[in-house]
Regions:
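Core RecA-like ATPase module of SF1/SF2 helicases and allied nucleic-acid translocases
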Residues: 2-195
């Protein structure tokens, strides 16, 4: 679950990497929602894909605005080995869901839309919104531990699979499909944790 991933991510950051800051250079982040805004002018990258991992190279400016927290960071795409600047939405880092919940996304939308109240047409407001860096902030989570859903399509040499909180009523066909997907993410080593 996202909740368990948050616990593991904090454990890795605090006890293995000795990171005390909320976000540090060297942190690995996973994009949790496709984003086209920040790569428009970067040759070779069409968009930041849901599930893509980036490394934080430098943490720049943090801001609180519209009832949300943002941070400008310099990142490197692991897929393309290209460095670029993005604005991330800090509120998604520790959220117990994969991205920004619908109610909070709507709140962000409406709060930013107020900045364009001087524009009379809805189309004009939407055009401005599409170019707003805060509205287009990248939704991310730490990438040291990820859910099986987010891991689909990827492979890691070593995988730790937490089977805690699996009760007998979950042991149906969907569980075995999930288990197959999780097991096949491991390229070399698989460790089963919290076996029932």
């Amino acid at each position: 679950s996202n909740k368990r991933c948050n616990i593991y991510n904090q454990g890795v950051r605090n006890r293995i990497l000795y990171r005390e800051e909320e976000l540090s250079a060297g942190d690995m982040l996973m994009i949790t929602k496709n984003n086209y805004y920040w790569t428009e002018n970067i040759e070779g990258i069409d968009f930041l894909a849901n599930g893509e991992i980036v490394e934080v190279l430098r943490v720049r400016r943090e801001q609180e605005l519209y009832g949300f927290r943002f941070c400008d960071v310099l990142v490197r795409s692991l897929d393309y080995d290209i460095e670029f600047e993005i604005k991330i939405l800090m509120d998604t880092l520790y959220s117990d869901v994969s991205g920004l919940p619908r109610e909070r996304a709507e709140e962000l939308f409406l709060n930013i839309l107020e900045d364009y109240s001087d524009i009379s047409t809805k189309a004009g407001k939407m055009k401005k919104l599409k170019t707003d860096p805060f509205y287009n902030a990248v939704q991310v989570k730490f990438a040291y531990a990820v859910t099986c859903h987010k891991a689909q399509g990827g492979e890691w040499s070593t995988v730790f699979l937490d089977l805690g909180y699996i009760s007998e009523e979950h042991l149906g066909i969907n569980f075995y499909r999930w288990l197959y997907t999780a097991i096949t993410r491991a390229g070399k080593k698989l460790y089963l944790v919290n076996l029932p």
